[in-house]
Amino acid sequence: MTARGNLFIVSAPSGAGKSSLISALLKDKPADMQVSVSHTTRAPRPGEVNGQHYHFVNVEEFKALIEQNAFFEWAEVFGNYYGTSRHVIEHTLTQGIDVFLDIDWQGAQQVKAVMPEAIGVFILPPSRDELERRLTGRGQDSQEVIASRMAQAVSEMSHYKEYDFIIVNDDFDTALADMRAIIRSQRLTGASQIHAQNDMLNDLLAG
């Protein structure tokens, strides 16, 4: 019997390395893991593929999906809507595939409200100085924008206590190993093993 997959909520302030960690986890395209593909009303950027990077829909379609209670969570960001499909995630989990949601603390709260068993992982930078260095090192933003991003990061980090696991991304390889350890540990819980090893357990206990 295939054990149900786990839903992992991964949140972090900008610059903490969340996207890089998720990309590294999925680099070899493991059959038992995938990142959730969100719906959005924003226009596709160059190189983005519908169904791979996002499900691109118009505002009317998105609002219809809201009315149908089709999203685990949704939000409006800078005039564009983003949402996580309830049906797609449920279907994927029943196939024994772990799903990763790359969302902020507000989205995490919405998901936890409807799926309390979802596992929250928060990625932190090792220090404020290092976070600012990473944000500045991108060389793409003005000091005003960096200051705004730092303030937003502090606000995001204030919600770390709402998560089940905390990873400090001081060394990338160590942080990646920590992430893999969390995933492995969740697959070895009693509930997961009862499903995965049901036939063996019944055989062991047969009179």
Swiss-Prot record:
<keyword id="KW-0808">Transferase</keyword>
<dbReference type="InterPro" id="IPR008145">
    <property type="entry name" value="GK/Ca_channel_bsu"/>
</dbReference>
<protein>
    <recommendedName>
        <fullName>Guanylate kinase</fullName>
        <ecNumber>2.7.4.8</ecNumber>
    </recommendedName>
</protein>
<dbReference type="GO" id="GO:0004385">
    <property type="term" value="F:guanylate kinase activity"/>
</dbReference>
<dbReference type="GO" id="GO:0005829">
    <property type="term" value="C:cytosol"/>
</dbReference>
<dbReference type="InterPro" id="IPR020590">
    <property type="entry name" value="Guanylate_kinase_CS"/>
</dbReference>
<comment type="function">
    <text>Essential for recycling GMP and indirectly, cGMP.</text>
</comment>
<keyword id="KW-0547">Nucleotide-binding</keyword>
<dbReference type="InterPro" id="IPR027417">
    <property type="entry name" value="P-loop_NTPase"/>
</dbReference>
<feature type="domain" description="Guanylate kinase-like">
    <location>
        <begin position="5"/>
        <end position="184"/>
    </location>
</feature>
<dbReference type="InterPro" id="IPR017665">
    <property type="entry name" value="Guanylate_kinase"/>
</dbReference>
<feature type="binding site">
    <location>
        <begin position="12"/>
        <end position="19"/>
    </location>
    <ligand>
        <name>ATP</name>
    </ligand>
</feature>
<keyword id="KW-0963">Cytoplasm</keyword>
<keyword id="KW-0067">ATP-binding</keyword>
<keyword id="KW-0418">Kinase</keyword>
<dbReference type="InterPro" id="IPR008144">
    <property type="entry name" value="Guanylate_kin-like_dom"/>
</dbReference>
<comment type="similarity">
    <text>Belongs to the guanylate kinase family.</text>
</comment>
<dbReference type="GO" id="GO:0005524">
    <property type="term" value="F:ATP binding"/>
</dbReference>
<dbReference type="Pfam" id="PF00625">
    <property type="entry name" value="Guanylate_kin"/>
</dbReference>
